[in-house]
């Protein structure tokens, strides 16, 4: 039977009008998209490790560079050392800014 860790991450960017002031914005949704790709790359099926970002949310309107975004992560593992390794990699991904000017926070839920 696999163990699991559920976590939640929040990303802050900077809002700007997407038509008139696009370059002043910092997209939290772009950051989220890049983090999702990096998080899913942690999956190692041969070792029984899976990382799934199953819920995402973000933005405030279609014509605004997204100032915030969130995601929820489900980590599954077989061996305890694999959990520790995967969690370390998850912390690295969340701690890294792929889009300059964004910040992210990870909260473990269980």
Label the model's feature ranges.
Residues 1-2:
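Acidic/histidine-rich catalytic neighborhood of metal-dependent amide-processing enzymes
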Residues 5-110:
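Metal-dependent amide/peptide-bond hydrolase catalytic core
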């Amino acid at each position: 039977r696999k163990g699991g860790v559920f976590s939640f991450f929040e990303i802050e960017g900077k809002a700007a009008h997407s038509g008139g002031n696009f370059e002043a914005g910092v997209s939290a949704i772009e950051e989220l998209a890049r983090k999702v790709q990096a998080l899913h790359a942690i999956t190692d099926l041969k070792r029984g490790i899976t990382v799934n970002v199953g819920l995402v949310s973000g933005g405030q309107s279609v014509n605004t560079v997204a100032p915030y975004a969130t995601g929820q992560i489900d980590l599954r593992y077989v061996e305890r050392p694999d959990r520790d390794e995967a969690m370390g990699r998850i912390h690295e991904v969340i701690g890294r800014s792929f889009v300059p000017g964004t910040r992210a926070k990870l909260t473990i839920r269980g």
